[in-house]
Amino acid sequence: MKKNTLLKVGLCVSLLGTTQFVSTISSVQASQKVEQIVIKNETGTISISQLNKNVWVHTELGYFNGEAVPSNGLVLNTSKGLVLVDSSWDNKLTKELIEMVEKKFQKRVTDVIITHAHADRIGGITALKERGIKAHSTALTAELAKKSGYEEPLGDLQTVTNLKFGNTKVETFYPGKGHTEDNIVVWLPQYQILAGGCLVKSAEAKNLGNVADAYVNEWSTSIENMLKRYRNINLVVPGHGKVGDKGLLLHTLDLLK
């Protein structure tokens, strides 16, 4: 892995003990539909959904305040191994996710990027460390993780950090406070895919969701910073809900009004 830090400031078939079928990604714009492959575990609590040959969305069903909530991250299939954006709700789900993707792609998970210190992102940190997987985060996320009783990720990401995993380029960006004090987003420049995490709401979201640690008055500015930095977005992956396009950022701004 090379690192350069910037800025100081349905048809169903059996596959790998899972279920594969054809589905679609819903966009904010109804005219944009992308056919995809979805692979699920036997219980339906974990799925990976193909965005392109090398980028998949991983989704796990966890529970928040007694309600079942699906949470999204990314799986990057690089020439040097697999990289995840976010772990999962807990160590059990994270362990099963790792085993599932390693079996599917016949590669090891080498690195994970943690986008903030809530359970749906960092809940599997112990499972990562047990496997020797590098867990990248900002220093603030590492600090907040420790305060919440989690093992600490590396704390090696700056305001903007450019990473390279084999042939795959990744940029992490801290646009400012919003869903949490520490939320970052992940940009894949080769594919123009933005993993917005919980800072970005899905098209079907009617409200801002969990705002217990939110900075609602600063959230809009952070979204605007993302729009200024990433002007040519192909797909946006929200922390929860369906994949969309740039319209998800605009929808989030509407919810903040």
Curated annotation (Swiss-Prot):
Signal peptide: 1-30
Cofactor note: Binds 2 Zn(2+) ions per subunit.
Residue positions binding substrate: 201, 210
Binding site for Zn(2+) 2: 120, 198, 240
InterPro entries according to UniProt: BcII-like_MBL-B1, Beta-lactamase_class-B_CS, Metallo-B-lactamas, NDM-1-like, RibonucZ/Hydroxyglut_hydro
Needed cofactors: Zn(2+)
One GO biological process term: response to antibiotic
A family per Pfam: Lactamase_B
Described function: Confers resistance to the different beta-lactams antibiotics (penicillin, cephalosporin and carbapenem) via the hydrolysis of the beta-lactam ring.
Similarity field: Belongs to the metallo-beta-lactamase superfamily. Class-B beta-lactamase family.
Name recorded for this polypeptide: Metallo-beta-lactamase type 2
